[in-house]
């Protein structure tokens, strides 16, 4: 090895040690600050402190139809109030439903996303300023674990859960309303990216003599007209589907925080891989 290459190697090792000692912790601090903001936006009110988390009203609408209108009240992960008007397709009669006073509906997607963010924060807090990273592999392992939690958190907000129509019919959501939902109407709430969505299904009962072509629909986020299912020994077909939605600004903020955090993790991994490429062997 020449003196020049030895000197270069010494400089690289010093830079790499500085990366492990200083820059890694600077990135971890950045990640912690960003994810604390994300967690705060996704947080639920503490018992007895519900007033600290503000209630927000959102008007549901669609640019193409007016069969369904609604106002939802969201407090963290909980839908605390819902006021829905549904125009019946056949008669143009308007049905009105609201949440019972003793009921609120937890949005599992927000709850799950918050849990993943908090797991990422726990990983970060396990490596405080006093911790000394000894190898690049150790940093990469931590970044991979954090990125896994953040990807799962993001996926919960971007990918609503699929449900079968019988699952929806048996859901506790159907028991939330006053007056009670009639047997030929079903609703579903879910998050899609930064939007809070309401889907309303209007159904008709299939007569026994018309069920020879009965083909139950599978699991889906959004079922189409014509989808069939059986519930409580009665066969139904979806006759009309109405979807309305509204943008929730803090969900959009949260998704941006996830993107920035994932980029920070990847950039740190990239820096470590650049150092490793300077050596003929893997020094970390």
Swiss-Prot record:
Pfam families: Rogdi_lz. It is found in: Nucleus envelope; Presynapse; Cell projection, Axon; Perikaryon. The keyword Transferase does not apply. Keywords: Cell projection, Cytoplasmic vesicle, Nucleus, Synapse. Coiled coil: none annotated. The keyword Nucleus applies. Its main location: nucleus. GO terms for cellular component: axon; dendrite; nuclear envelope; perikaryon; RAVE complex; synaptic vesicle. Belongs to the rogdi family. This is Protein rogdi homolog. It comes from Danio rerio (Zebrafish).
């Amino acid at each position: 090895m020449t003196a020049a290459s030895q000197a270069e190697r010494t400089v690289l090792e010093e830079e790499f040690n500085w990366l492990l000692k200083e820059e890694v912790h600077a990135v971890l601090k950045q990640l912690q600050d960003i994810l604390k903001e994300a967690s705060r936006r996704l947080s639920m009110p503490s018992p007895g402190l519900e007033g600290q988390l503000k209630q927000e009203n959102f008007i549901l609408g669609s640019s193409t139809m007016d069969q369904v209108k609604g106002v939802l009240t969201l407090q963290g992960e909980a839908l605390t109030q819902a006021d829905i008007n549904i125009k019946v397709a056949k008669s143009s009669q308007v049905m009105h439903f609201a949440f019972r006073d003793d009921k609120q509906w937890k949005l599992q997607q927000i709850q799950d996303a918050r849990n993943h963010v908090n797991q990422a924060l726990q990983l970060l807090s396990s490596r405080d300023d006093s911790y000394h990273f000894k190898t690049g592999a150790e940093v990469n392992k931590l970044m991979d674990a954090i990125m896994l939690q953040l990807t799962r958190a993001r996926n919960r907000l971007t990918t609503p859960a699929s449900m079968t129509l019988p699952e929806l019919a048996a859901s506790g959501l159907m028991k939330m309303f006053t007056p009670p939902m009639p047997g030929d109407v079903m609703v579903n709430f879910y998050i899609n990216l930064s939007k809070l969505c309401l889907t309303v299904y209007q159904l008709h009962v299939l007569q026994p003599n018309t069920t020879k072509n009965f083909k139950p629909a599978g699991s889906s986020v959004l079922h189409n007209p014509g989808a069939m299912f059986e519930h409580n020994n009665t066969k139904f077909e979806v006759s009309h589907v109405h979807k309305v939605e509204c943008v929730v600004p803090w969900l959009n903020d949260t998704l941006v925080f996830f993107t920035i955090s994932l980029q920070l993790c990847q950039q740190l991994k990239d820096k470590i891989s650049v150092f490793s490429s300077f050596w003929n062997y893997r020094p970390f």
